[in-house]
C-alpha cells in the first residue's frame, strides 16, 4: 500500500513539474531566449564547456548554475561578466522547473539571447525533470569509463546532443571512445555525438555548430 502511495506522489510531482516547465518555456519564448540544459556527472566538463561557449559565441548569454550546496560554479562563471544565478538544491540531486522558475526571476531576460542551465552533476536524477529548456546537452568524459553510456541509457535517450569529453585521456584509462559513440547512437539513433578535448579546444567548434543548428 505504501509503495502505491509513493508512486502516486512521485507521478504527481512529475506532472506538476511538467506544467511548470511548460510555463518556463512560454516565458523564455516570449522573451526570445533559447535555453539549453547541460547534464553530466561531476567532473565531466560542464562548466568548462559553458565557459568555452561564452568566450566563443557572439550572443548575449545568461547562466543558471545548479549545485547541491556550494555556488562554486556560479562564482567561476561570473568572471566572464555575464548574468549568472546560482541555485542550491539542498539534498536534491537535480534542478527542477520550480527552482529554474525562481532563477529566471533574477535574470534580465530582455537582455539575453541564450540561457545555459548547468544542472547538478548526476546522470540519473535529472532525467525525468524537464526544466523548460529547448535543448538538452549531455556531456560525459572518457575517464568515466567506456561503459558509462550503457549504464545510463535514459539520459542519452532524452539528449539532443551528446558530447564525449577528455578523449585525450582515453588511452591512459583504457577507454574505447568509439564504443561510447556507438552505444549512444544505438540508444538514440537520431542524436549527434561529438568527441572533444576541451582543454585543447578540440571539438568546441563542432559543438557551437550543433547549437546554432538547433536555435
Where on the chain are the PLM-derived regions?
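Iron-sulfur (Fe-S) cluster-binding modules
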Residues: 1-23, 169, 199, 203, ...
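Nucleotide-state-sensitive switch-loop elements of NTP-binding domains
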Residues: 4-39, 44, 53-134, 145-147, ...
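Hydrophobic positions on the alpha1 helix immediately C-terminal to the Walker A/P-loop
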Residues: 49
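Active-site glycine-centered loops adjacent to acidic/histidine catalytic or metal-binding residues
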Residues: 67, 165, 197
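Short, glycine/polar-rich helix-capping loops at beta-to-alpha or helix-loop-helix junctions
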Residues: 70-74, 148-152, 176-183
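Short glycine-/polar-rich loops that comprise or flank the Walker A/P-loop
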Residues: 132-135, 157-160, 188-191
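Conserved phosphate-donor/acceptor-positioning beta-strand/loop module used by diverse small-molecule
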Residues: 134-143, 160-165
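Canonical P-loop GTPase G-domain recognition
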Residues: 169-215
Amino acid at each position: 500500500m505504501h509503495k502505491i502511495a509513493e508512486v502516486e506522489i512521485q507521478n504527481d510531482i512529475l506532472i506538476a513539474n511538467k506544467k511548470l516547465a511548460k510555463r518556463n518555456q512560454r516565458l523564455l519564448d516570449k522573451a526570445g531566449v533559447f535555453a539549453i540544459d547541460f547534464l553530466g556527472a561531476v567532473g565531466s566538463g560542464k562548466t568548462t564547456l559553458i565557459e568555452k561557449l561564452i568566450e566563443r559565441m557572439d550572443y548575449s548569454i545568461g547562466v543558471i548554475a545548479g549545485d547541491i550546496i556550494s555556488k562554486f560554479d556560479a562564482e567561476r562563471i561570473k568572471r566572464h561578466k555575464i548574468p549568472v544565478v546560482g541555485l542550491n538544491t539542498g539534498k536534491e540531486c537535480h534542478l527542477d522547473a520550480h527552482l529554474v522558475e525562481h532563477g529566471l526571476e533574477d535574470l534580465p531576460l530582455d537582455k539575453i539571447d541564450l540561457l545555459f542551465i548547468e544542472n547538478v552533476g548526476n546522470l540519473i536524477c535529472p532525467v525525468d525533470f524537464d526544466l523548460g529548456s529547448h535543448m538538452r546537452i549531455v556531456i560525459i568524459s572518457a575517464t568515466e569509463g567506456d561503459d558509462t553510456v550503457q549504464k545510463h541509457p535514459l539520459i542519452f535517450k532524452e539528449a539532443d546532443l551528446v558530447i564525449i569529453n577528455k578523449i585525450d585521456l582515453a588511452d591512459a584509462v583504457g577507454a574505447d571512445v568509439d564504443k561510447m559513440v556507438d552505444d549512444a547512437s544505438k540508444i538514440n539513433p537520431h542524436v549527434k555525438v561529438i568527441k572533444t578535448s576541451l582543454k585543447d579546444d578540440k571539438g568546441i567548434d563542432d559543438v557551437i555548430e550543433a547549437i546554432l543548428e538547433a536555435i
